[in-house]
């Protein structure tokens, strides 16, 4: 019998939890595995696999679609994360799935703001009113405000070279 190792990230809780699941995990088995590692699931908590647009839902005996070896399971109180990006004098807001990564937000901003590829490669997302620049594989729910399900970024040059 093959076991699947999955990585759990919970909104409002730092770090990553590693756990093992069976090869054909059901929604009920996944919820039981989450409870076993101290992650409480209630009616206001949603489970996402990787960067899926929709949360897992259904009966306990139904398959937990998308669960595979090495995947990330995201547990969030937000169904969507509203990401706002400021670039120069422009602002763009869009809703993303909680498991969406920073790189998806940047890609959307680059497209909307019509930034050439060379310039896009020299810019990063920085949290508004801070100097923090999250890694491109950071899930949005780990940065979002828990009450508003929102996060704000500035698209800034990675390095500023003065001549």
From Swiss-Prot:
Transmembrane segments: none
Cross-link (Glycyl lysine isopeptide (Gly-Lys) (interchain with K-? in central tail fiber acceptor protein)): 163
UniProt keyword list: Antiviral defense, Isopeptide bond, Repeat, Ubl conjugation pathway
A biological process from GO: defense response to virus
Keyword tRNA processing: no
Domain Ubiquitin-like BIL-type as annotated: residue spans: 4-80, 81-163
Domain of life, per lineage: Bacteria
Biological role stated in the UniProt entry: Component of the Bil (bacterial ISG15-like) antiviral defense system, composed of BilA, BilB, BilC and BilD. The Bil system specifically conjugates a ubiquitin-like moiety (bilA) to the bacteriophage central tail fiber (CTF, or tip attachment protein J) via reactions involving E1 (bilD) and E2 (bilB). Modifies CTF of phage SECphi27 and SECphi4, which probably interferes with assembly of the phage tail. Also modifies T5 baseplate hub protein pb3 (gene D16), but not gp27 of phage T6 (Bil defends against T6).
Protein's UniProt name: Bacterial ISG15-like ubiquitin-like protein BilA
């Amino acid at each position: 019998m093959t076991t699947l190792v999955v990585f759990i990230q919970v909104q409002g809780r730092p770090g990553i939890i590693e756990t093992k699941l069976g090869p054909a995990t059901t929604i009920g088995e996944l919820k039981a595995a989450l409870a076993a590692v101290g992650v409480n699931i209630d009616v206001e908590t949603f489970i996402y696999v990787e960067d899926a647009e929709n949360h897992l839902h259904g009966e306990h005996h139904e398959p937990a679609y998308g669960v595979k070896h090495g995947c990330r399971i995201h547990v969030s109180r937000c169904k969507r994360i509203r990401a706002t990006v400021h670039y120069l004098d422009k602002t763009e807001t869009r809703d993303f799935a909680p498991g969406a990564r920073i790189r998806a937000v940047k890609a959307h901003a680059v497209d909307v703001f019509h930034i050439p590829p060379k310039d896009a490669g020299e810019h990063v997302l920085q949290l508004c009113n801070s100097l923090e620049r999250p890694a491109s594989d950071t899930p949005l729910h780990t940065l979002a405000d828990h009450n508003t399900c929102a996060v704000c970024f500035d698209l800034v040059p990675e390095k500023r070279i003065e001549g």
